[in-house]
Amino acid sequence: MKRIVLFWIPLLLLLLVNCTTESFDFGDQEGILVGGSGGGGSSQPNPTIPEGSEDLLGFTIAFDESDKTAYGSMSETVTSDDDFIENSQFASVVTIIYNGTTAAVSNGVSGVEVSSNGAHVVVNSTVSGVEYVLSGTTTNGSFKVYSEKKFKLSLAGVSILNPVGAAINIQSSKRVFVVCADETTNVLTDGSSYTATTDGEDMKACLFSEGQLIFSGGGSLTVTGNYKHAITSDDYVRFRSGCNITVASAKKDGIHTNESVIIGGGILNISSDGDAIQCEEGGITMTGGFAKLSTTDNKAHGLKSCLDVVISGGAIQAQVAGAASKGISCDGNLTISGGKLTAFTSQTALYEDNDLSSCAGIKCDGNILITGGEIAIQSTGGAGKGINCDGSITINDGTVKVITTGTQCVYGKLDSSAKGIKANGALTINGGT
């Protein structure tokens, strides 16, 4: 009996790959979406499923509501890394209490100067070991920092709306520990347009920093980016266990960095028009936590990395609604050794700039290595892909489920079909389910 089982397992895997990589038509889908000039796009009927093959698709794909608790509440091991606030001390405290159009400042720290114009507060600091504690509510205020040293920014039940700029603007290239005080609710909102800034200063998000942003604490933070991005660092952003960050909406990206994004724990709920999380020049690492990602624009991705993406733990739930959007878009290599990814794409392919681009749960320009974890992808739009890799794909372990149901898209001499798993290089399956 064992020999029979061992014989059928590789045969079943082979049938699954063959079945889901064809362009089977499960129903009428929309045609191609043209983003550039000209016409000529269409949807073409695809081959029908061979009799009996539908039995191979005896599974469904859905978001598991228990993932938020199971992965979001996981603890994180504290190391000697400078990103862990446990390795730093902040003995000096400056408090700012917002109240409508004013702000009350308590500052007894030598080397820290605080000025205010109504509820718009500006800090200039030349000393280390300072904690700034923000609380209260303003509908016309902000918090801006110039500092030569790393500092702690405690959000202790604060709500800041700045109708003409960023709610928090950190003009410092040093590390900032953003701590949401336990059992507090914090809200940051910017305006739909910004007034002119000081020459040479960047300001492109509701919460902006020139340096690293390290999020932690047991409270919650909700950010709305009405102008551009919700949270931006010109360096990197790290999310630690215990944090609870919501991007209610963003006109561009939810989280945008010049460098990398590290997700070690916590709960992220990001809704954006553009990419939910984008790294312009860095990679993305996820070892724990829960990230629910929702995007609406064409070519807007759940995770967008210009380098490698490495996932060893945590759970990602991505729903991308725009044409040619991806759950994960990786310019480098993708390695998945643990955790859980569930991704849904629903739109059709997009013709733009002489290129025909389709939706995909995963799109990787480099190589993909899967040694563990759970991957579940459903792509229902025209020419949608489950996993689309320009390099090679190697699956040694883990669970991979893919459902694609879109029609073929044709534009002139270009065409694209729905595929479960597509690799331009080698596709090697050594194990897994």
Regions found by a protein language model. Name each.
Residues 1-6:
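Positively charged n-region of N-terminal signal peptides that target proteins for export
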Residues 15-18:
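C-terminal motif of bacterial Sec signal peptides marking the signal peptidase cleavage site
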Residues 9-13:
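Hydrophobic helical h-region of N-terminal Sec-dependent signal peptides
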Residues 20-433:
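A composition-driven surface/loop motif
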